[in-house]
């Protein structure tokens, strides 16, 4: 009987979804179990703390278990059984772009071609019926109740096509064996059918994917891969999009876009991502693959230093937006080392731009061309963002104050500004008349470069033992950082988790919410912490947070 129960409750064997994805795809996202996603989310600390306060029913937590059980046994409505068994690959096969103009100026309208490829683990007839039913429902939702239906044949597979109100809009569905494909373009469906049938190579044959997938985990709840071709295609649009956020001047937009294009094309060659539920939260890993000559050039100067006690955190107040710690050997000479490594490996345009950037950076901090800081600074630099329009504050461990003193004087006097000394809580603060409100102060072994008000908050945090270094939630997640982490970032705000949970409450019509209980529960939700390492093949970042990218649920729900 036990053997019978084992086979009756065993999940259908998983298929390798990358064998359904065409090699020509720009990117794909893989989800192997929806029930695992539901079960993982409802087991997070954020869900367990906030769901009761928002009146979200326990039935949602049990839904994942029920779906998994129906998927294993095959008992239940066809759609429910398939939901419990299905594996999904979202495939990006292409991106079209067109320029447009609006009230706020010109912008780029991107139109991705994508396909949802679903392994139903069911019969061909059931998969075909499901494809037709779901495609018709989606078409009505997208185009209205009055829809037209067309059919065509592609190597024996029947394509169901629903034309949209414009020639460039359509919804297409097809099935192949137990696989269902639904897409916004017929070419995407045909490309996926070619891969599934063996008429075209699949992304499973991609050497980078085979070699590096293990770096982010082979059994993640969510996995994604952007190919080298995908990176190159995205780079065509990304610089212009980023530049338009930096400036509104057309000439400067063009300059920034061209520079970004030069650097990105010569640097990145792929991206891998995974998300997994661990320790009451979500662990996400990002591996940005770099071209071999660039990876070594970046990894060497950004080699992590032996991690100290991160004493700078005792100066960081709890009421901040986030902080980032740079823990790198010889941090004082980092810009020059990076420049020395990168310039020989990029083209002339990018090389000149990098030189100008380093010169400008040194000048901003009062450094003359002959100044060298390597032996004057420690390995710990902390950047603190207080939020809003406030400038970023910097905390630097200093080993040689006399060497730093003339540089600090030039920093405070930049642009002809005058500096004056004031005392705050027993600490001398040098305040500049510069328009950006810059000021400086030494507290113990650390130099603070910030505004006068920010420095006061840091002095108070240190004097009252109220810095984030005393936060038990932070201490817990800092217990086991990757050994080679050169950058550590922390974000205490967990509003993204709250917004996700409120979206779930709205969709499920839960309630009423207990506001006071919700605020208390939110204080117990773990903050976000990430670690970045630079390796000889790329950059890997591990993020540990309350809900991770699943916070996008709030956007999908329109909340």
What are these regions (language model features)?
Residues 111, 156, 174-180, 281, ...:
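Short, solvent-exposed coil/turn segments at beta-strand boundaries
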Residues 149-153, 171-174, 273-276, 418-423, ...:
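Short, exposed beta-strand/loop patches in secreted or surface proteins that constitute
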